[in-house]
Amino acid sequence: MKLKSLALTALFASAAFVGQSVCAQTLARTSALVTQADGAGGFNAHFGDTFAAATSGNTFSDVFTFNVGNSFDSAASLTSSYLNTSLTKDLLITGFSLYKYDPASMNILGNAIAGVNNTLPGTHPTDSWSLSAFGLTGGSYALKVDGRVVGSGGGAFGGDLAIAPVPEPETYGMLLAGLGVVGFLARRRKTA
């Protein structure tokens, strides 16, 4: 009799552990951005992700990688959308950042640049985030989007990245020399 109750107790205890393992998981995805030249030496890229209804309750961490050869300035924006109903927020974006990383080890180099949450107050607003970074050096970079799928219909987010080259120091020297020549000619005309 004692053996039966001991076995039954062990069965219930193991069932409790099995029940705890069925919890929300983190969905992690990494993909390279497809860039398009903008005709002015920089480039643009679009990024995003869609989550099925079965992922409701899960958190996510999406990483979008890109490489830049020279110094650059960047700006990015991110919004979420309603998939299931316009009355219930489907995604909750909790973080948006840009960082430089080592492609061999995937380690972050230096500090990440955090995005700004521009989401308006109210009931179930659409997420809106922005990010700006200036004077960054060339190398491998990544945009990271963190969040949680809260709607019963899944969810989606999308964003844009714009990269503009930073002028080389020689360009500033030529600019100053040109302004000096213009100033000299203007002064010469005034005295003549």
Predicted regions and their residues:
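Short, threonine-centered small-residue motifs that mark membrane-proximal processing/anchoring sites
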Residues: 2-26, 158-186, 191-192
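Mature extracellular "passenger" or substrate-interacting domains of secreted, surface-exposed proteins
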Residues: 25-165
